Every structure is written in C-alpha cells, then in structure tokens.
C-alpha cells in the first residue's frame, strides 16, 4: 500500500524517525538486543538521555537451535513498562534472521510497538511487510536493491502512523496528513529518486525467488 511507504534516505534515518517520534519518558522501557547495529541503537540512546526512558539490552544466542530460543529472549525481557521493541531483521554480526513476525505478535498482545532495522535483509529475499506484522520497517536501497546511495524506504503500518512525527518540516507540513509528510524535504535530489525506481524495476525483473536462491 503506497499510503504505508515513505521514501527516505537510508535505514538510519528511519530508525531516527521512530526514536524521535514515540513519546516515552521515565519509567518506560525500550528493548534493544545485543546484536543490534549501532545505527539502530544510537538514536534510542540519544533520546533516552533526553527523555529518561530505560534501554533494556538482552543477549541473543550466537548459534540458536531454533527461533523459539530467540523469541524466549524477547519474552523474558518484556515487562509492564515495555513500550517499544527495536530489532534488526537480519544481524550484521553473524547473519541471523530474527523472527520478526513472532516477536511482533507477542509484542502487540501487550500493546508494544515493534520497529525493524532491515538494512541487511531488504532485497535479499521476498518480504511481505503485512505478514511480518511489525509497526515500522526501515531499509536502505543501495545495499541489496542496488539503488543510488541516499535512497531508502520506510514502512509504517496504517494504524501505527499516528505515533510518527516528521524529522524535517517544510511548507507542505500543515496541509498533508498522509505518510508523505515524512518525506517532505522540499528540494530533493531527483536523480536518486529515479534511480531507486529503476532499481526496483530491475529487482522485479530478476525476481525475489531467484535472488533468494543465490
């Protein structure tokens, strides 16, 4: 759904967008496991210092025997104060693919938002964002989609968009309440946008199944 996708610059911007937006304060907790990428961790650390919420850092197994082992780590880390789980889809440390869908289902049963850093997975295999059930999903285009650098995508589930606030505002801010408000940079580098479109066309030409098989 195009009303759930905004064009951003990279994954880091998307994770900053979420950390900047969600109203948290003293007593609230955000879960960030120990395999998170620094670019997805630092935004939360920054806002934790300003707003006073707590960051919980559970340790994931290096060689898990099943996805249930990973899910259990998140389950044990959740408390009545947990408001957000921020997690990578695929780790840059050992290549683990984390069970985003199962963690999201568990989180939503307790009104916890889930933000996903997809820098290492977007473009590597077929992904159904609705099926993952996460609230937010940020990815860069230049890694496995082969777009120009400086292009990324940000997914926000429709019923979770109410939590988001633009990182940058300009003259269209007050007349646009759609997800477009998150990409309202005024002047943009249009060749990058065109390059992203061409990269998506090329990706679709090859097909997700062939890329995943490799």
Model-derived features: where do they sit?
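Pyridoxal 5′-phosphate
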Residues: 1-214
